[in-house]
Amino acid sequence: MPMAELYDLFQRGMQLLEAGDFNAATVPLAKARDLDPEKASIREALGRAYFRSAQFEAARAEFEALVERAPTNDYALFCLGRSLLELGRPKDARKALALAAGLRPDRRDYRIYRDRARAAA
């Protein structure tokens, strides 16, 4: 795997993500993910870009892949739950959001979305 290419793709994707060009960010980040699908930082950034560009099914897939590899990643669980909520799947979202809130009880936003999923389910 060409490491320089992977790094350049990731950096370009992050620049676009930070600039708020979420849809454009998915292009280099997806290419980077294809080069190194095990790299959590790439999958997280790609999931964020998909979520922010309202591509919720694609975001769900990225965050689900992260949770499969790291079941105690509170941020990935939170984002998975948020994606599932956006897809109209509050029952599925409840578990991920409850786990995220349990792992990080200090995160008020996690508790708010957990409670929303419970109420909607």
Locate the predicted segments by residue:
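TPR/TPR-like (Sel1-like) alpha-helical repeat modules
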Residues: R82-D109, D115
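TPR-adjacent "capping" and linker segments in tetratricopeptide-repeat scaffold/adaptor proteins
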Residues: M1-D8
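Structural signature of tandem alpha-helical TPR/SEL1-like repeats
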Residues: A19-K31, S53-A65, L87-L99, A121
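Mid-chain, well-packed structural core segment of small domains
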Residues: A61-E86
